[in-house]
Amino acid sequence: MVDAEKIKKLREMTDSGFLDCKKALEATKNDLNAAVKWLQENGKAKAAKKADRITAEGLVAAFSNDKYGVIIEINSETDFVAKNQKFKDLVNKIGQELLKHDFYKYKNIIEEVKIGNETLAELVASASATIGEKLTFRRAEQVKKFNSKQVIGVYNHFDGQKAAVLIIENGTEDMAKQLSMHITAMNPLFLDEKEVPEKEIKKLRSEFEKDEQIQLKPEKIRPKIIEGMINKKLSETTFTLQEFVVEPGQSIKQYMNSKNSFPISKIRYEVGEGIEKQVVDFASEVANQMKNKA
């Protein structure tokens, strides 16, 4: 017979459901430590069954200390789970742990870094079993300060769907935070003009040369018009050329020059970037379930 007090204790230790704890204790003859292990193994089995499900929701979050800036994305199947406090705590726990490590020392930091006895990947798999939905640790990146003049800024949008981390040189923490907020809002593709690939400029030039409206202009002035259009496009996609949302009328470059500052590196994440969300036909799904039960 299962000890009710041990069920309560096991639930407190693992956050697992009542029935799962009861099964674990039955399977291990009321041995708490063995029951914890049973739940972990069973949780991984459950996670494996969920492996083919698409995880396009979730949270992104940026963290920083006096040396590193870290940004991570952990995905879930539904936005409902993304709002779950246990899921938020998991994201925060992993982010804070990653601030202790230099990413360059690892081949696969998600599989190598541990919290307690579990790797980060195993921790997410265990949480998947507890929360009851497939979770995926999709990605993590780090920026690193190389001198005392450099400052890290992070910004997390209130909904947890967008975040950014930035390093600047010769600036304040408040300035770095405002600039990282700009990156979160405006999503620049490139840090500065030097980072814009030549193939991007060639691509834009080719597109504008084929533009019917430009073809109607006199041939002599077309190159100048095209250069102007390229510069306008780059001012929309390049961080230093964008208009600063906090100081309208000034570009980021002008603002930073006035502070004798310049950007070093940036990373921006948005939940589900590049993931094709699964579109579910509810009527068909119900019909298939009824068919399988028949």
Swiss-Prot record:
It holds the Pfam family EF_TS. It is found in: Cytoplasm. GO terms for cellular component: cytoplasm. Its main location: cytoplasm. SUPFAM superfamilies: Elongation factor Ts (EF-Ts), dimerisation domain (SSF54713), UBA-like (SSF46934). Residues 78-81 are annotated as: Involved in Mg(2+) ion dislocation from EF-Tu. GO terms for molecular function: translation elongation factor activity. PROSITE patterns: EF_TS_1, EF_TS_2. The keyword Protein biosynthesis applies. Keywords: Cytoplasm, Elongation factor, Protein biosynthesis. Associates with the EF-Tu.GDP complex and induces the exchange of GDP to GTP. It remains bound to the aminoacyl-tRNA.EF-Tu.GTP complex up to the GTP hydrolysis stage on the ribosome. NCBIfam families: tsf (TIGR00116). Belongs to the EF-Ts family. This is Elongation factor Ts. It comes from Mycoplasma mobile (strain ATCC 43663 / 163K / NCTC 11711). The gene is tsf.
